[in-house]
């Protein structure tokens, strides 16, 4: 299971879905281009 858009996440343990990345500043998954 992965985390989608605007889901809170841990930058050290990035479980965001494919094409998303965990923002270190905001601590939620952002779309990654």
From Swiss-Prot:
The places in or outside the cell where this protein is found are: Secreted
Q: Tissue specificity, please?
A: Expressed by the venom gland.
- SUPFAM superfamilies reported in the protein's UniProt record: omega toxin-like
Alphabetized UniProt keyword annotations: Amidation, Calcium channel impairing toxin, Disulfide bond, Ion channel impairing toxin, Knottin, Neurotoxin, Secreted, Toxin, Voltage-gated calcium channel impairing toxin, Voltage-gated sodium channel impairing toxin
Q: What is its main location?
A: secreted
Q: Which GO terms describe its molecular function?
A: calcium channel regulator activity; sodium channel inhibitor activity; toxin activity
Q: Which InterPro entries does the record associate with it?
A: Huwentoxin-1, Huwentoxin_CS1
List the cysteine pairs that form cystine: 2-17, 9-22, 16-29
Q: Which residues form the signal peptide?
A: none
Give the modified residues of type Leucine amide.
33
Q: Which GO terms describe its cellular component?
A: extracellular space
Mind listing the GO biological process terms from this record?
envenomation resulting in negative regulation of voltage-gated sodium channel activity in another organism
* Its job: Inhibits several voltage-gated sodium channels and only one voltage-gated calcium channel (Cav2.2/CACNA1B (IC(50)=1.1 uM) and Nav1.2/SCN2A (IC(50)=3.7-80 nM), Nav1.3/SCN3A (IC(50)=88-5570 nM), Nav1.1/SCN1A (IC(50)=170-407 nM), Nav1.7/SCN9A (IC(50)=95.5-230 nM), Nav1.6/SCN6A (IC(50)=49.9-3990 nM), Nav1.4/SCN4A (IC(50)=113-400 nM or >10 uM), Nav1.5/SCN5A (IC(50)=1524-1634 nM or >10 uM)). The toxin acts by shifting the voltage dependence of channel activation to more depolarized potentials and by blocking the inward component of the sodium current.
Q: Note what the entry says on domains.
A: The presence of a 'disulfide through disulfide knot' structurally defines this protein as a knottin.
Q: Extra info from the record?
A: Negative results: does not inhibit Cav1.3 and Cav3.1. Does not or only weakly inhibits Nav1.8/SCN10A.
Family label: Belongs to the neurotoxin 10 (Hwtx-1) family. 04 (CcoTx1) subfamily.
Q: What is this protein called?
A: Beta-theraphotoxin-Cm1b
Organism in which the protein naturally occurs: Ceratogyrus marshalli (Straighthorned baboon tarantula)
């Amino acid at each position: 299971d992965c985390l989608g858009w605007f889901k809170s996440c841990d930058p050290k343990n990035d479980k965001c879905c494919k094409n998303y990345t965990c923002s270190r500043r905001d601590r939620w998954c952002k779309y990654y281009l």
